[in-house]
Amino acid sequence: MLRTVDLSGRSVAVKVPATSANLGPGFDTLGLALAQYDELRVSVRPEPGATVVVRGIGEGEVPTDETNLVVRAIAHTFESVGVELPGLSLVARNSIPHGRGMGSSGAAIVSGIMAAKGLLQGVADIDAQGLLALANDMEGHPDNVAPALFGGLTIAWVTPDGPRFKKLIVHRGVSPLVLVPERVMSTALARSLQPASVPHEDAVFNVSRSALLVAALIQSPELLHAATEDKLHQSYRASAMPETDRLITLLRTNGFAAVVSGAGPSILVLCSDPGQRLAAARLVATQGAAAWQPLMLAVDFKGATVPRIAEDAVSGEGDTTAV
């Protein structure tokens, strides 16, 4: 039985970063938060149901009723703490590309969960582990939502008691470049191309590279090229995104640590410094790859942010803190 709580007048603002999952060898384990953001404003309204206004990416395309992914994430969070969902008014300002492997679905889920956490402040407390569990309930893969929640580099794993994460601070020299194509890619299609099993030696190869990649990202960026080699998933998906595969091959041949971003088709290039990032962007430009939008992004270290006290957000005086 859900209890009714008076949340009249409450409003909350949320800001969630883009993410890149896998990072080459870290399939379903590693994720990186990137400084490109979706922003959300949620207010409680007297009327039941939800209204949604979407601005920016997804405007005119994503649902604007209770079936909206953000609304569903809010509802899931309220239900998890036994509180009835009030009427809601949502305004979303999106800049994370959809269907490009930059975590747009995960960002929507995290936006909703964090908005619910803000609205429920003083009513129900949800700790970091609880936030990850709620997000994983909806997304299904914690590596996709952990960096959006907590920022930085995250290692995610699943135990019998639920998903877990470890956040690490990335070396200040690491300079991500994301190359975004015009076409989209279905995550479900990308996963369907994965084999049921892989050779033992390929698994060993990826274990070594994943361990090396963590060290490269937090301590030794000069090892990024060697550390981003992969034999578990990218080659199996190449047939579904040949342009991505060709550009990654070109970049890696020229010494750049290029990998598929998430499920693709975007490419993440992990550069050891801003100069190398500029060189990678210039190489892509010389190939006539005009269809690829280069995004020179910083690593986001905060993750999702939300006002400290929900009521303060009404007057715009809320103190913004990370999870």
Swiss-Prot record:
GO cellular component term of the entry, any: cytoplasm
Reactions catalysed according to its record: L-homoserine + ATP = O-phospho-L-homoserine + ADP + H(+)
InterPro entries xrefs: GHMP_kinase_C_dom (IPR013750), GHMP_kinase_C_sf (IPR036554), GHMP_kinase_N_dom (IPR006204), GHMP_knse_ATP-bd_CS (IPR006203), Homoserine_kinase (IPR000870), Ribosomal_Su5_D2-typ_SF (IPR020568), Ribsml_uS5_D2-typ_fold_subgr (IPR014721)
Family matches, as PROSITE patterns: GHMP_KINASES_ATP (PS00627)
GO molecular function, a single term: ATP binding
Annotated positions binding ATP: 97-107
Pfam family for this entry, one: GHMP_kinases_C
Pathway in which this enzyme or protein is active: Amino-acid biosynthesis; L-threonine biosynthesis; L-threonine from L-aspartate: step 4/5
TM ranges: none
Primary location group: cytoplasm
UniProt record, GO biological process: threonine biosynthetic process
Record protein name field: Homoserine kinase
